[in-house]
C-alpha cells in the first residue's frame, strides 16, 4: 500500500521559514514547498537542506519556489512572510506593511489550497490572522495563530531557570494578544503538579521575582530583537509552529494556547485572540474556557481591546 506523504507549504523563506523546512525534514512530517517572492532564496535554502538528507537520513522532497501555484492542494500551510522587527520597533509597527502581504497570501490560499490547515506566524500576530482569514475564507477551525505556544515556552523557561529545575516540570500558559498586553496565567501555572502559588508560599521563589518573569515574558521577543540588532527570534518560533503542526497532522489533540477565532467564548465576539485550544485532525476541535481571577480577567479584557483596536485600524 502506498502511503501518500503530507504536503506542507511554507510561505516566507526567511529565518523562520528556513528553520521550519529543516525541522519538518528532520521529523519527516511531509514534503515541503518553500515559497518566497525573492528569486533564488527559497530555491537555495531548499537545495541546501536537501543536500543534508543523506547525512541526516530523511526522505522528503523539498521544493523552493516563487510561484503560488506550487502550494496547490497543501495539507497544511505555515505563513511567516512579511518584514521582521528591528530594534526600536513594536510588533504593531509592522501592521500596514504585513497586512498587504497577508492579503495576497490569503487570496492565494483561497485559490490553491482552500482545504489546508493554516498556521500564521507573521506579526502583529492576532491582526494578521484576521487578515488571512478574511481573504482566504477558511473555516475558523482551520486557521490559527502561533503566539501562545511561544510565549508560554518563554514563561516556562524563565520560571525553570529561576527555580533551577527541569523545564519539563513546569506547566504554564499565556493568554491574550501576542504583544505587551499578553496575560501569563500565574493562577494556572504549576511545578510538577504543585500550583505555583504554593511554590511561592514555600519560599522557593518570591512573588516579586514571578512578577519580573511575567514582565520579561511580555518583552521576550524585544529582548532577542535588541540582542540580535538585525532580525528577530526564529528558533523558538519555529519550534512552536512545529508543535502545532504535529498536533494537527498526527491527530495528537494537544491543548495549546493559540490565537483562535472566538464567537462568544470568554465573552468575546468575532476576534482572533490567544486561548487554550485542542488541535487535532479537524483543526481546532475545541476552545477551552479557563476561569481567571479578577486581575487576570482585567488584563485579558485589556488585551482583547488592544487587539480589537489594532484590527479596526486596518479598516475594511
From Swiss-Prot:
Binding sites annotated in the UniProt record for NAD(+): 12-17, 36, 98, 121-123
EC number of this enzyme: 1.1.1.37
Record GO terms (molecular function): L-lactate dehydrogenase activity; L-malate dehydrogenase (NAD+) activity
Disulfide bonds: none
Binding site for substrate: 85, 91, 123, 154
Catalytic activity: (S)-malate + NAD(+) = oxaloacetate + NADH + H(+)
Enzyme class: oxidoreductase
PANTHER family: L-2-HYDROXYCARBOXYLATE DEHYDROGENASE (NAD(P)(+)), L-LACTATE DEHYDROGENASE
Active site (UniProt): 178
Role of this protein: Catalyzes the reversible oxidation of malate to oxaloacetate.
InterPro entries in alphabetical order: L-lactate/malate_DH (IPR001557), Lactate/malate_DH_C (IPR022383), Lactate/malate_DH_N (IPR001236), Lactate_DH/Glyco_Ohase_4_C (IPR015955), Malate_DH_type3 (IPR011275), NAD(P)-bd_dom_sf (IPR036291)
Sequence similarity: Belongs to the LDH/MDH superfamily. MDH type 3 family.
GO BP, sorted A to Z: lactate metabolic process; tricarboxylic acid cycle
Name of the protein described by the UniProt record: Malate dehydrogenase
UniProt entry keywords in alphabetical sequence: NAD, Oxidoreductase, Tricarboxylic acid cycle
Organism in which the protein naturally occurs: Wolbachia sp. subsp. Drosophila simulans (strain wRi)
Amino acid at each position: 500500500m502506498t502511503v501518500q506523504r503530507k504536503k506542507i507549504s511554507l510561505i516566507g523563506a526567511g529565518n523562520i521559514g528556513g528553520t521550519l523546512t529543516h525541522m519538518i525534514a528532520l521529523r519527516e512530517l511531509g514534503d515541503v514547498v518553500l515559497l518566497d517572492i525573492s528569486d533564488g532564496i527559497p530555491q537555495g535554502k531548499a537545495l541546501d537542506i536537501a543536500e543534508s538528507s543523506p547525512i541526516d537520513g530523511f526522505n522528503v522532497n523539498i521544493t523552493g519556489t516563487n510561484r503560488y501555484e506550487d502550494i496547490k492542494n497543501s495539507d497544511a500551510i505555515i505563513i511567516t512572510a512579511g518584514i521582521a522587527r528591528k530594534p526600536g520597533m513594536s510588533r504593531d509597527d509592522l501592521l500596514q506593511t504585513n497586512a498587504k502581504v497577508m492579503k495576497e497570501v490569503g487570496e492565494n490560499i483561497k485559490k490553491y489550497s482552500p482545504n489546508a490547515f493554516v498556521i500564521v506566524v507573521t506579526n502583529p500576530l492576532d491582526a494578521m490572522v484576521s487578515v488571512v482569514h478574511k481573504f482566504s475564507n477558511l473555516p475558523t477551525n482551520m486557521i490559527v495563530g502561533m503566539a501562545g505556544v511561544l510565549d508560554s515556552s518563554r514563561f516556562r523557561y524563565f520560571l525553570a531557570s529561576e527555580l533551577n529545575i527541569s523545564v519539563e516540570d513546569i506547566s504554564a500558559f499565556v493568554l491574550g494578544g501576542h504583544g505587551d498586553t499578553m496575560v501569563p496565567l500565574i493562577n494556572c501555572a504549576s511545578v510538577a503538579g504543585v500550583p505555583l502559588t504554593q511554590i511561592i508560599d514555600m519560599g522557593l521563589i518570591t512573588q516579586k521575582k514571578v512578577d519580573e518573569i511575567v514582565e520579561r515574558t511580555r518583552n521576550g521577543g524585544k529582548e532577542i530583537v535588541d540582542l540580535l540588532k538585525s532580525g528577530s527570534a526564529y528558533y523558538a518560533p519555529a519550534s512552536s509552529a512545529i508543535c502545532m503542526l504535529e498536533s494537527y497532522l498526527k491527530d495528537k489533540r494537544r491543548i495549546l494556547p493559540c490565537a483562535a477565532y472566538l464567537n462568544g467564548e470568554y465573552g468575546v465576539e468575532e476576534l482572533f485572540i490567544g486561548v487554550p485550544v485542542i488541535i487535532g485532525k479537524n483543526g481546532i476541535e475545541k476552545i477551552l474556557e479557563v476561569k481567571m481571577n479578577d486581575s487576570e480577567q482585567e488584563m485579558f479584557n485589556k488585551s482583547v481591546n488592544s487587539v480589537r483596536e489594532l484590527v479596526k485600524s486596518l479598516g475594511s
